A protein has these predicted regions:
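Mature catalytic core of soluble alpha/beta enzymes
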Residues: 1-188
Length: 188
């Protein structure tokens, strides 16, 4: 069972949802709206979706779909879900358009074989899938759709300070302010 927390700040019409451990990090979201019931429902949908995606993409969970692929695809063709097939096709597109810099195999994406009827195999036993550089961004795109479907115009989501989504405005300003350290000068 996924541990989640949330709190509504009535004066600001701000909802804060928090998951301490999902996809290898923490997740926070701020949703600005006055309808608390609507926000609670949206939060439940978001938390459910994050847990669902974690069960597909978390290579550290031995029961996840990616773990099953990593454990068996070098030995024989195995069937994958339609969503996993779509994710792999998207990752293949990123692999090609980045001149092979984006590679979820950490070796050579070309050694993944996608077969008809949603089957996958690896041509080498050294290949495994790691969605660490992909899963949080993919999840944020899904979350954005949930937020837009509810016509929430102001929201901010943060995955462990490495992947963020800002929509609209902060309740006390023109935008959601973000900052990050300059890796070449930590004093800035």
């Amino acid at each position: 069972m996924l541990e989640t927390r949330c709190k509504y700040y009535e004066n600001e019409a701000m909802f804060h949802g928090f998951i301490p451990h999902i996809m290898g990090t923490r997740f926070d979201i701020l949703l600005i709206h006055s309808d608390i019931d609507r926000l609670n429902t949206l939060w439940a949908d978001i938390a459910y979706e994050l847990e669902r995606l974690d069960k597909i993409l978390n290579r550290f969970d031995p029961h996840s779909e990616v773990s099953k692929i990593n454990n068996h695809a070098s030995q024989s063709k195995i069937q994958i879900s339609k969503e996993m097939k779509s994710i792999l096709q998207l990752c293949s597109y990123y692999y090609e358009t980045t001149s092979h810099l984006f590679d979820i195999t950490l070796k050579d994406f070309s050694q993944i074989q996608l077969h008809e009827h949603s089957y996958i195999s690896f041509t080498s036993p050294d290949i495994s899938l790691d969605f660490g550089g992909f899963a949080k961004g993919y999840a944020l795109k899904k979350i954005r759709k949930f937020i837009e479907q509810e016509n929430i115009s102001d929201a901010f989501a943060n995955f462990g300070n490495s992947s963020i989504l800002g929509i609209g405005h902060h309740p006390y300003g023109d935008c959601w302010k973000v900052s990050f350290l300059n890796p070449y000068n930590q004093s800035l």
